[in-house]
Each structure stands twice: as structure tokens, then as C-alpha cells.
């Protein structure tokens, strides 16, 4: 008799950086024969349809995102709104609770995978189904910022509290700087959807779900996973690296032709995801740093705060000075294919979990320039613990970087004969070989599937 199969619902936070990894996991679980109902904002569905590799088993369920005063009309995901308005988007998602419950009731699902919707475990319990908080944020970050060891101190956490690891945390090398601790302290208490604080939303999600899930490996984050399992007293399901399937379409000709004009390993690719918006001075310092390296570069960036377009934010005579060797592009690109291109030798990343995964699967050297939240601890883990990248130096108090610090990090990572470059290159090569082992992924998905069976009894 074959292994049991289940009807799984997916309802990730309305951000492409969450929707996409949930779909990658859905593809892996569909291979095991599970039926997936994937709830997704209506207009966003077409963006993900090309990545649905099992349309016979994975069905998209459209969700009309309720309008909330203050949101742009038609806004569906975080890429449609500036960062300060994400709290209103969370409010809109919270207002789908009744619709979601009705959908689950009609579909007769067995288990739901979710994140950020702290009401989901209660909905699941009412319907007699299980809930898994499948968290895109790394276990290292959750353990550092959201564990019961933090929450149960009986008062609001200060900057000083957050600059010290929580009791029992397994890694003393991860430390926050002053400006980072200040930002984390503010983020914990900010309202994120109605009157619910960000830290409370996450803590309730982890405390009341039946299991936690993460896209990681024990070989990389095992101690952090053990810490969370003991802190929350519930199972942790690890899906492994969840390597995206190779894209079916080739790299767009405009980029294939441009990258093809440079020697192997010589181009810097710089991208900060669909949400990161830099301040004007930091945007221009970043571009200055790219120019100072003397290397060809492709920078994919959003317009900085206060600018309507990337073009109007460029320094005077910038385009003339980098003509033929530098491009600043506003808009979506095929990042996975760009990172795979032989000309790309360095990736300056904001350290979002999806971008880091794609980077580790490829050969380019990593330069780490985190912006907010979990990106900071991701960068610290990559640079201090795993030593697979070089982090850009920032001011201790103000958190600002300079063009010179960007250039210095690139040179440290790229220069021939540099001990730092050799160390991160060797460590990255070992990590890449480990992650691309097909037996590794299949064993993790098998174990994930087994733990899911145990959970559903």
C-alpha cells in the first residue's frame, strides 16, 4: 500500500518573497502525490502560474484582497505598496479570515501552511485541521528575536536587551549593532495589521500552530532549530534547500547579449528584491561604490525614496561615466538565470532568504548589504558563522554605508590573492556542492513528508 496523501492548503503572506517559496514547496509535495489548494491574490496568480509544475495537483484559489482605506486601489502584494503601508496590506489579509474558513470548509483540507496570519491556528482548530507555520524567516532570526526566552521577560525589550543573545541561544557570533537593535526594538512593537503588534502576531502564530516549518537544513541551522523546538515545545519540519526547478524560458536577449560582452566572472550583479527602497543618499553611495570597483555591473533597483524613477535619481553625468560597462535597471529580471550566467562573478544582495538561496546554488562571490529585519541576521550568519560572504561595513550608530565601503567589500570578496576572497570562495564552493546534492534534497523532502504524516496521524 502506498504512502497516504493529503489535501494541503497554502496561504502565505501577500509578498512575492513568501508566495514563491510556498509554491516551490508545493511543487515538491505534489511530487509525493499530495493535492494542493494554493490561495493567492487574484491578479498575482498569473505571475506564479509559470512556476506551477503540477497543475493537475496544484490548484490556485483566487483571493480578492479587500480594500483598506489608505491602500492604493488594486494593491495586492508588498511590491504594490511602500514599506510604511504594509501594515494596511496585513489588515486587508486579516479581513479574508471568513472567506478562507469557508474555502477550507468546502475543500475539506487536512492541513494548512501559513505565515503571519496569527488567526489561522484558531480557524484550523475550529475545522479540525492541522496548521503549520511555514516560516520564510530563518530559524536563527526567529530564535534571536521572537523566542519565548525573549517574549517572557515581562517588559518591552530595549536596544540593550537585543544586543545580547537570548538565554540558551546557540550562537554567540551573531550580534546586533546599535542601529540594528534600535530598528528591531521599534519593529517588535509597531502595529502590523489593525491593532496587532508585529511581535505579538508572530509569537501567537508560533505558539498556537501545531508545527513549525522552515526552508533550511540541519547541517546549516540545526542548533537554531533545536533551540526553537525546545522553546516552543512543538515539532520543527525542515524542507531542506527546496531547490527551484530550472526555468523553462531562456534569459531575455537584452541581458544575454549584454552579459555576453564581458569575460567570465567579471560582472557585479546588484539586486535588493521587490520591496527594498533605499534613501536617496544611500542609493547614490551604492552607485558610487559600483563605479569605484572599476568592474562592469548590472544594478536592479527600485527608485529611492523621493524619486519617481531610477533615472531621475542617478547622479549627474552618471550614465555617461559608466557607458558600456554599467547599467541601472528598474523592474523585474530573471535573477536565477542572471546568477547562472558565466560573466557574473559577484552578487551584492540585500540578504533576503530567497536571494541567498539562489546565490548559494551558484558560483558568484557574495557581498552582503542587509536592509531590514531578518536580512541582518542572515548576513551575520553568512559572514561570521558560515563565512561564505563579505558584509559591507556600516556606521555603528546611523547604519549608513559609503561608496568606499561598498567598493572595499567587493574587492575583499573578488581580488586575486586576497585571503578573505579565498576563504569565502572555498566555503561557498563546499556549501554549493552540499546543497546541490540531489540525495540531500530528496532525503529532506522524504523526512518532511514523514513528519507531516506523523502530525496528521
UniProtKB/Swiss-Prot annotation:
Extract the Pfam families matched here. UDPGT (PF00201)
Its UniProt entry gives the catalysed reaction(s) as: cyanidin 3-O-beta-D-galactoside + UDP-alpha-D-xylose = cyanidin 3-O-[beta-D-xylosyl-(1->2)-beta-D-galactoside] + UDP + H(+)
Looking up InterPro entries in the UniProt record yields: UDP-glycosyltransf_plant, UDP_glucos_trans, UDP_glycos_trans_CS
Q: What is this protein called?
A: Cyanidin 3-O-galactoside 2''-O-xylosyltransferase FGGT1
**SUPFAM superfamilies, A to Z:** UDP-Glycosyltransferase/glycogen phosphorylase
Q: What is its EC number?
A: 2.4.2.50
Per the entry, what this protein does is: Xylosyltransferase involved in anthocyanin biosynthesis by catalyzing the xylosylation of cyanidin 3-O-galactoside to form cyanidin 3-O-[2-O-(-xylosyl)-galactoside]. Required for the accumulation of anthocyanin in red-fleshed kiwifruit varieties.
Picking any one GO molecular function of the record gives: UDP-xylosyltransferase activity
One GO biological process this protein is involved in is: anthocyanin-containing compound biosynthetic process
Q: What class of enzyme is it?
A: transferase
Query: What family name appears in the similarity comment?
Result: Belongs to the UDP-glycosyltransferase family.
Q: Which UniProt keywords apply?
A: Flavonoid biosynthesis, Glycosyltransferase, Transferase
Query: What pathway annotation does it carry?
Result: Pigment biosynthesis; anthocyanin biosynthesis
Q: Which domain of life is it from?
A: Eukaryota
Q: In which tissues is it expressed?
A: Expressed in ovaries.
